[in-house]
Amino acid sequence: AIVEATDGSGPLLKLAEARAQALLGAESPSFSLLCLPPDKGSEDALFARLPRFDAVYTCGVLQHLSDHELYEGACFMERAVTDKGTLIVVVPLDHKGDPDRKTFLRDSLDYATLFERMGFRLASQEIRDGVGSPGHECR
């Protein structure tokens, strides 16, 4: 399997790469600096080097994107996943939005609607509280 790990922070990416090398050795994934939404050059370079993916996983990123950036990031993910692939999105729904700190409050329907309009189908949804217990969506 081809695994490509990405992060928008160079120092965090280097830390993750070092830990993966220590744990996995030769089986470690490749690592790329990639911000969402990616600039056109980064996106084209990534797709020139790698195939489309059977699964794309994003955790704790999308709530930091403005509406325009979220749309651009979603377009990138739609391009990155194969036609029968899976997109897994993890976002906190129970914190206050704060544009000054670059966090935007959206409910689960906002995310589901965006990705469904891009051709994805919602297969499953879980809403948990801040400690991981089954919870509810705060509005």
Which residues make up each language-model segment?
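Short catalytic micro-motifs in class I SAM-dependent methyltransferases
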Residues: 60-64
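A conserved beta-strand element that flanks and buttresses the S-adenosyl-L-methionine
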Residues: 57
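Class I (Rossmann-like) S-adenosyl-L-methionine-dependent methyltransferase catalytic domain
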Residues: 1-49, 65-72, 76, 86-139
